[in-house]
């Protein structure tokens, strides 16, 4: 990852009123922290929080799991899932904002400069009953540009916006006194 050159960003106005951002970053990846925070500076985003990620690849995470360790998930998936639940919980308990952006530390905001809309325009276009809006996908085929209901092949935890109501549902289902219950479907 390279550090951004910080020339004047003439498109930063497009992200005015963006909700608080919670980005997930492994403690052992300081260059990704620098990368993300240089992007936030470039885009004039000040309302962000780093969430220390759980590394399921190398660490035994059984001490943060409540119930049966999920056998249908890889250790990396357990680390990813619990890190996202940790980020959601942190936002839910420390902020009164109606919604938040949760993102991983390899998101590239560069495409925002090509938007022909602002964040405010984007928010006005959302269905009134949204719970989660996926803002980045892993796509092995065509990319759908318009807002659409979830498709089976669109998956990613790279970046999404979540509202308080849905966060509360997820936490009630998966969080038990600082531990994460994943044997009930994650």
Name these PLM-found stretches.
Residues 1-103, 107-186:
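An acidic/histidine-cluster motif and surrounding catalytic segment
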């Amino acid at each position: 990852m390279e550090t951004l050159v910080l020339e004047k960003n003439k498109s930063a106005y497009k992200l005015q009123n963006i909700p608080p951002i919670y980005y997930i970053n492994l403690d052992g990846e300081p260059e990704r922290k620098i990368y993300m925070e240089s992007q936030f500076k470039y885009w004039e985003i000040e309302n962000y929080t780093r969430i220390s990620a759980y590394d399921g690849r190398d660490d035994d995470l059984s001490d943060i799991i409540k119930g049966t360790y999920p056998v249908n998930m890889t250790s990396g998936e357990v680390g990813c899932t619990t890190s996202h639940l940790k980020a959601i919980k942190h936002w839910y308990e420390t902020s009164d904002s109606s919604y938040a952006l949760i993102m991983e530390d390899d998101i590239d905001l560069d495409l925002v400069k090509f938007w022909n809309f602002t964040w405010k325009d984007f928010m006005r276009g959302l269905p009134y009953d949204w719970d989660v809006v996926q803002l980045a996908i892993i796509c092995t085929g065509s990319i759908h540009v318009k807002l659409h209901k979830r498709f089976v092949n669109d998956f990613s935890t790279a970046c999404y916006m979540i509202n308080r109501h849905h966060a509360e549902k997820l936490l009630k289902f998966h969080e038990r006194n600082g531990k994460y219950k994943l044997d009930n479907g994650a």
